[in-house]
Amino acid sequence: GFQRIPYFGFYAIPVIAELGLPAYGHSALPLPPKFGITFEDLLVNHYQVAQSGNGEKRIKQIQDSHFGYINTGDALPALENLRSIRSEIVKRPMLATLEKILMPLQADGQSFIATTYFHRGYEVSLTEIGKRSQFDRVIVGNGMEGTTLFGVHKEAKVFIQDGNKETQSRSLKYSEMFQEGTAKQILESHEALKEIES
C-alpha cells in the first residue's frame, strides 16, 4: 500500500457492501520491499484484532455482515510460511503480483475482483492471470498501489476481463464523470495532498 497519502481502500469495502455488493479484502502484515499499509496491518495494529487463528470467525463475520477482511496467513498458510524468505529478497517478488488475485473465499453466485496496478505492464499479467482464475470478472485499473482506488485525479485506464473473452479497456476521466465543481474539488484535493508529501 501507498503510505504518503490517506489510505481509503480499507474503508471502501464496507461502503461497497452497503451499496449491496458483498465484499472482502485479503492481506498479510506488511512485507518488503515497501512495507506498505495493508488491511491486516490496520486490523492488528490499529484496531487490535487478533492476527491469526480466527479465520473461520472472520469468514462468519463476512457471511453475516456482507463485508470483512481475511488474513492471508489463515487462508493460505503455505504463502505466509514464505514470509522469512520474502524478507530476505530485496526486489518485489512475483508473489506480490499473484497474491492480489487469490480467492480465499468464493461467493455463492458470481465472484469479482477489483484491483489496481501502478507500473505500466502489470495490467497485462494481471488480466492474463484473471483469465486463468476462478473469478467471473477481473477488473484491473491504473491507480494507487495496493488499493482499489483508481486515479481519479487523472485519466485512468481500467481493464475488464470476463472469463476467457478478450480484455476490454475503458478510460475513466474524472473531468467527464463528475460535475465541474466536483471535478475541481478532486483536482484541488489531489494537489493539496501532493504538498503534504513534500
Description of each model-found segment:
Residues 50-61:
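Phosphate-binding loop that captures ATP/GTP phosphates
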Residues 31-47:
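Active-site-proximal loop->helix
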Residues 27-34, 144-145:
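Acidic, glycine-rich active-site loops and adjacent beta-strand->loop/helix elements
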Residues 44, 49, 63-198:
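Glycine-rich anion-binding loops and their surrounding alpha/beta cores
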Residues 1-25:
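Active-site cofactor/substrate anionic-group-binding motifs, chiefly glycine-
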